[in-house]
Amino acid sequence: MKRIIGILFAIIVLVSCNSQKVYSDFDISYSKNGGPSPIYENLLIKANNVHYSFEGQGKKIKKEFKLTNEDLKKLDNVLSQNNFRRIQEDRKKLYDNVTTSINVKKGPNEGSKTDASLVMPNYKTNWDNILNAFQEIINNNVKKQ
């Protein structure tokens, strides 16, 4: 009996640890959260596989889908053309603001940026172009309910 309980416990631990792996094992992440009426939106890309989740405004969406190599190349080009690595963040203190964070873990655009305290004005257009590229991926692959 103890052996069966031990095996069941080990299986439960392994399954629960594996379910969190999707949130740490990614190449590119896009995260939008916060605000007076909080929302939590995550887009995690690992190779061609994408995990999307949205929670807020009375909705809860989770979706897995694939991106083509062309889609990934297009996203990488947008990051490069808009100098993702050179975007400068402002240092203002903001509260109850919806913030967006982008984290690129590999490739020439490797880096992490957030607009939690806004982006410096001369980089605002670049930042908006990058956000639009991620939003286009979401709009093309996730049907909002």
Residue ranges and their predicted role:
Residues 62-89:
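Mature extracytoplasmic domains of secretory-pathway proteins
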Residues 19-35, 57, 85-145:
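Short, well-ordered, aromatic-rich surface patches in folded extracellular/luminal domains
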Residues 15-16:
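C-terminal motif of bacterial Sec signal peptides marking the signal peptidase cleavage site
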Residues 11-12:
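Repetitive helical segments and hydrophobic/amphipathic motifs
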Residues 2-8:
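Sec-dependent signal peptide recognition
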Residues 35-66:
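Post-signal-peptide N-terminal segment of Sec-exported extracytoplasmic proteins
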Residues 2, 47-48, 66-68, 103-106, ...:
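Solvent-exposed, well-ordered amphipathic alpha-helical segments
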